[in-house]
């Protein structure tokens, strides 16, 4: 059996993954080393709306990828943009992590119990909406029965970390994207444009990973 997500056939046969998932950019042990002990920068403010996202990492074709989504045109903000699974807090959420895991389930059908949460990285503020985003980094299984939310998620796709860690592929640009002037980190990948808060969060993660990637992991 397979699951189809806009051009991706996802086999449902589960393969046992090794702890390392080696690739030329970085492996699982190095990701844990970079993120698990990181002392994050938290941003607070009375006028900011609390939100959280999951930064899902998975081992696909023997290298680490990050899962991203493309929003539908039916959502209230950031229509058609690339983002992580996530959203604003609900009264029933007992923590920001609960928010990130709930939203990941709603948008991609990744179950909370299937996420190995590694840690948090720096908060990020979206000035246009007044959101402050708390990113949680975690490993998820692959293959997996992903399911895109009809209301919120137009596409689910995967970007190799080696692409994001390549300064010729992911770098600061000044350009008009979606009718908006933007200056910041951008990556064009497989017809998708990764920018904005998503780009800034990935830029921060890449910065953490670049240091540990230079250190051999045993």
Show which residues each predicted segment covers:
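Amphipathic alpha-helical blocks and their helix-capping loop/short-beta junctions
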Residues: 150-180
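N-terminal leader/linker segments that precede catalytic domains of diphosphate-processing enzymes
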Residues: 3-4, 9-12, 21-83, 88-144, ...
